[in-house]
Structures are given as C-alpha cells and as structure tokens.
Amino acid sequence: MVRQVVLDTETTGLETSQDHRIIEIGCVEVVNRRLTGRHYHQYINPERGVDQGAMEVHGITNEYLADKPVFASVADEFLEFIKGAELVIHNAPFDVGFIDHEFGKLDDYSPVATHCGVTDTLVMARQRHPGQKNNLDALCKR
C-alpha cells in the first residue's frame, strides 16, 4: 500500500526568517493513487498580522483568523494525519520549511522529514517541461 498526502499551506508572508507563520493547512489522503475521502483542513491563528501582499494572493484576513486555533493546539492532530505518508507538495521546500518552523516553536517535535517522505511536484514539472511556466495554474492548463 502506498499512502500519500497531498498538502498545501497558506502563510502570513514568504519568509520564516521574518517569523511569518502558517495560516491554513489543507491535505487529502491518497492510497494506491486513489482518493480515500480522508482529509485534514485547518485555518490557524498566526498570532501576528498577515502581510498585505500575502492577503492579496490568498484572501485570508486577520479578522477571519482571529478566532481560529493556534498551531500548538492542532500540531498533534496534524502530525498524526501526515505521519508515515509520502507528502506530495508543489514547491515542497516552502511548505516543509514553514511546517518545520512551526514545529520548531514547540517542545518535543522533530522535522517533517523524520516522519514522512517528501515529493516535490515543482521539481517534477521542471524536469518534464523545462523552460516553461510550472506554477500550478500553468500546469492545470496543460
């Protein structure tokens, strides 16, 4: 059995070095290349403001996030969902970097790579379509 979790995040900005945080995690489970119907989705209060540029991309406002749980309160449930799976992520270093940044703020958590394999679909797209746009919108149009 091959268990994969297709994952995406939204964030307050682009840089963990500026303490930007995850504000949304969405995942679907795939077993043997078939959707199982299991998913994980959570909006997260980042305990900081969302940069205007990021808000223009994803449309998630500070007001909407104000009553959402903080990452620490959902970390166990999220880790349980992804543990042991191969994560499939477009531009994986970005998402994994943010997930590791969030786990790094907590006690007794280790990096994602200790729990999961990671496949980066952006790397795959660049190999298959060199010199072309390989963002998700461009790939969906092909």
PLM regions: where:
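Conserved non-catalytic scaffold segment of RNase H-like nuclease domains
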Residues: 1-116, 129-142
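Histidine/lysine/aspartate-rich catalytic loop segments that bind and position anionic ligands
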Residues: 115-124
